[in-house]
Amino acid sequence: MTEQIYMKLNDKVKRPTLSKEKINRENKHFKRVVDQYERWCKDGGGYETRETYEDDIIKCLFESDHDGYQLAEFLKEEVYIEPDSELVDILDEVSTIMRSLTNEIVGQWVKENFLEIPSDVVGKKVNAKQGYRKYENHYITGIKPETYEVTVSDDINKKGGWVIRYEDITFLD
């Protein structure tokens, strides 16, 4: 199978991960949340530069829990603010920023490395892994070319399913 041979090259083309250095501060989701956070801080008497507010949100991106309340508590300890429900609502959007930034760098990686998922893989039987979860004897039900991912399901006729990185599947047929 040609796709199996191609996939053995995956150790040469590593999927990028988000790091503080790779954050696009011009990302629309990032800018929107920073704007809201800056407005919230300034309403409470804050007077820092925009870069300071951006750095606070970047710190939140790399916390293990993206729950707005937990991030508000983190910022309370980190930058000495007094959070309220409005801040919690603002910080609830951090997971959206994370997903947007990650999709942005992965999309760039896909373009730079000319990665394509063949359209004929839909319907093929695969085993897949995602973190500690394994999906055995599943079918590819869809393709997400912009992020080099596929959806897999145990039902071949299902639309959608679990989203798995293409390099983490093994063809069975």
Residue ranges, per PLM feature:
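Basic/aromatic-rich interaction segments and small domains that mediate binding to polyanionic partners
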Residues: 129-166
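Mixed-charge, Lys/Arg-rich low-complexity intrinsically disordered regions
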Residues: 85-122
